[in-house]
C-alpha cells in the first residue's frame, strides 16, 4: 500500500533482529526500515527491497534515528525518485560486502540529507544506480557519507552521477581502491558543488581510484564552489564528444595527488578545464601527472580563466613541480593561468596558446615536442630540449615573452637548399642564459656535405634585448661533420637582435679514418726491421723472435679523436741459401693487433690478425731485396 512501513522504531524504541531479516515493501512513498526520534534498528543480516515511486528501502530519520545492518546484506529500491540507503539527519551503518541498488529516474542508491545525517558503508560494497538523473552516492546540505575501501560504484543513464556532494558542507569520503563507472550523455563521475552564497561541499578519495566515464558532454570530475581531493595513483578515463577529464569553475578546486593519470578521447575533448565568472577556480597537480588527450580540436590543459598549476604547498605560488607526461595542447584565456614546473624526464607533446592569459613552463631535464605555432609567457629551459621538428616538417614559430635557463637545446627544422625557410624562435621581452640551436634538414639530405650553402642568412631567432646567448650545435653526417656558425644583426626598424646562420663548414675527419692505414704500415714496418736485423747480424740474429709494441695517435679540439693499439708478433727465420754473390734469409711470423678508437661522436674497436711470410736477400756488393707476403 502507498505510504506503508516494514519496520519502524521511534521515541527511543529499539528493534533487534538476529539472523536474516527479509523485507519487501510495495507502494508509493513506502519505507522498508525507518528509525526516527532516537529509535534504533539493528539487523544482523538483511535483504530489503522497496518498489514504488519515491520509496525508501532504509531511512535513518531525523532526531537521532539509528539503523545498523550487518555484512553481506542487500538493500534495493525501484521507482522514480527511489532511495535504497538513506539518512535524513539520522545515522545509518552498513557492514562489509553490501549490495546497494536503486533503479529509476532520479533514483539514489545512497542518499544523505541535511546536517547530522551520517552514513557509513563497510569494505567491498557494490553500489549501483540506473536511470536518468540517477546517482550512486549523494550527500546534500551538510550530510556526511563514508564509503570504505574497495567499493565499486556505478551509475547508468542520461545525466547520471557516480558521486555527488552538493550544497553547504556536504562531504563524501571514498576509501582506497574505489572503482567508479558512469555511463550516459551528460554523466559525471565526481561532482562537488554548491549554490551561490553557501559554503561548498567536499569529496575526498583514497589512493588507487579508478574512475571511468563515458558519454557525450560527460565529465570525470566537476567542481563548482566545491572541493575535490583525489588520492595518489588515480586513473581517470573519459570518452565521448565534448568531454572533460577534470573541470573546475566558480571557486571550485581540485587537487590531484602524486601519480595521477587522466585519459580523454573524443571530439572537443579536454583533459583539464578551468573557468569562472567570479572568484577563481583551480586545479593543482601535487605530484607526477600524466594527461593524455586524443582529440583533433581539444586541449590537454585549458585555463579559460582560473588556474592550472603545479604544487602550491598551501601557498599561492608554485613551490614544486613533478614529472609530467602531457599529450595535447595548452591554452589560456583572459585571466587564465597555466604554471607548471616540469621536472626531470617530463615530456610535453603539443602546442601552446597563451592568448590573453599566462602560460609559464619551467623545464628541467625535460622535453617539449612542439607540434605547431606556440606562444608562452615565461619559459625556463634548463638542460632541456625544445624540439620544433614534431610538426610534420612544417615551419613553426615559438614566441616567448621571457626566456631563461642554461644548457637547453632548441631543435629547428631548416631547408638547407634555400634561405629563410626554417622554424623560428622569437623572444619579445627578457632573454637570459645560454641556449643551443640545433638544426635538422627537412629534405633528408644529411648525407650531403654541400648542404646548407644556400641557407646562409636564415634568421633562426629574434630577441628583444637581454644578454642571453645562442650557439649552434655542430651536425654529424655519415662521413663528415658540419660546423654551424651564428652571427647577430641589430635591426633599427624593429629593435630586435636577429640571430642568423652565418656559415657552414664541412669537415672530413680523414685523420681518424687514416688510422687503419697507419696501423697496417706499422705492422709491415716491424717485419722490415726484423729483416734489417738479419742483414746486419747474419747468423747470430736468425731463429725464433718476439716483439710487442704499442702506440697512440689522435688530435685535440672540436673534432678530436684518439686511436691506440698494441701489437704482438711471434716469428721464426733462418738462412735459406748462400752463394759467392748473395745470402738469402726467409721466415714466417704471426701478428695480432688489438686497438680502440674514440671520436667526438661514437667509438669502436680495431683488431687485426695476420700470417706473414718474408724473405731478405743481401748481395755481396751491398744491395738488398726485401719481400713480404701477408695472409
Model-based region annotation:
Residues 1-3, 14-29, 40-54, 66-81, ...:
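Beta-strand-rich solenoid/repeat architectures in extracellular/passenger domains
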